[in-house]
Design a protein with these regions (language model features):
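Glycine-rich adenosine-cofactor-binding loop
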Residues: 3-20
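A short helix->loop->beta-strand "cap" motif at the edges of active sites that frequently abuts
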Residues: 4, 29-30, 86-90, 109-111
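Short catalytic-loop micro-motif centered on adjacent basic/acidic residues
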Residues: 8, 67-69, 89-93
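Glycine-rich, highly charged phosphate/nucleotide-binding loops
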Residues: 45-78
Length: 162
């Protein structure tokens, strides 16, 4: 496994292809590999037409051990299974993706939970994110969630910012 090249997991079959994240990571020149549980082979949105992997078997082996999960709560367990199958050892559940059963399954599989509920795009730096993400970052700063330690307990009562 490489130190670079995280796996970005989306699911176009339920409307959760991470087009904004895909575009932002592309603009920031981050190395990543997008796995779509819905079977897309090309990206959508502002970076349309770029390579997307429709199955774990299609992913290059040189990705890092981190998977960013950007799916509906109903597909979160399937995304965890895919991350594990891909050889990832760490998972980050983006906002509105945290489902307690998926978090429990990740732990059963020995995966480290990096974060539950915060969008990783916000941590790229202000100059690299679109206006909508900047507004989201501002709301995180206003509510104090920006500086909080990583959230890894799926059962804690909290609000996820959208």
């Amino acid at each position: 496994m490489s130190e670079e090249g995280f796996v970005l997991i989306g699911d176009s079959s339920d409307g959760h292809f991470p087009a904004t994240s895909f575009h932002v990571y592309t603009l920031a020149r981050k190395r990543f590999y997008c796995l779509d549980l819905g079977g897309l082979t090309e990206s959508r949105g502002s970076s349309a037409g770029q390579k997307v992997y429709p199955t774990v078997a299609d992913l290059p082996t040189e990705h890092s051990d981190l998977a960013l999960i950007w799916v509906s709560k109903g597909a979160a367990r399937r995304a965890v299974e895919a991350a594990h199958e891909a050889g990832c050892r760490r998972v980050w559940f983006s906002f509105l993706t945290t489902e307690p059963g998926a978090v429990e399954r990740a732990r059963e599989l020995g995966l480290e939970i990096v974060e539950l509920g915060r969008c990783p795009v916000a941590y790229l730096g202000r100059e690299q994110v679109p206006t909508g993400c900047r507004i989201h970052m501002g709301s995180m700063k206003l509510t104090g969630t920006w500086q909080r330690p990583p959230q890894t307990d799926a059962n804690v009562r909290r609000r996820e910012l959208v």
